[in-house]
Amino acid sequence: LYNEAQLSDNPSLTESQLGFSPFVIDMFRTNEDPIMFPNVDWNDYLFKNLAWQTQHNLTLSGGGERFRYFVSLGYLLQDGMLKQLGESYDPNYQYKRFNYRSNVDIDITKSTLLKVNIGGHVGAKREPRTDELWRKVLWSTPFSSPGIVDGKLISNIYSNRYISIGERSCPLDYYYNYGYNVDTDNVLNLDLALEQKLDFITPGLSMNIKGAYNTNYNVKASRTPS
């Protein structure tokens, strides 16, 4: 089709001036040399048909006359849409989160109640270090690279002198050669409440003392292949 478009614009072009010579077309047809003349569907090569999400929750509650508790634990894993193609590390998109909550009521005395509530989460988001990947998948030609062959990434076929058109960069360069970032977020919320009944002064009178501590910090880490 590219040749036909060229001839439609300029019918006087010779075979040597066309984007794809008969030799090149025949090499694609026979798949005789898939290294020098690859034909890769990058969407199918790189992307999964689906990305799994798993979530688990555990809840416990109980206690006795003077001690009562509630504990909730949760874990979430969201996998990415990109395939793992055998490299020694995985730069795929991923999100993991562990969340927790604990509520404890303690009757210190018959008139004194202590409430301790703890909650928070730890989340880690991983993603490739470049935002060029999606654009390169759309722009790259099927013959820009054969991908990973025998465990080795063949990024660009600069020696291929037979084809000079199209985007020659390989999406795998932007997937594997730039590394990845991991962004970890840690949130902790703690609050305490002390309830003291003062019926000995006036029936129904009580005193509440409350305190809270909240913290949130973020850690960013990067890995770049050597």
Which residues does each predicted region cover?
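N-terminal, post-signal-peptide soluble/periplasmic segments
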Residues: L1-I35, K110-E127, D131
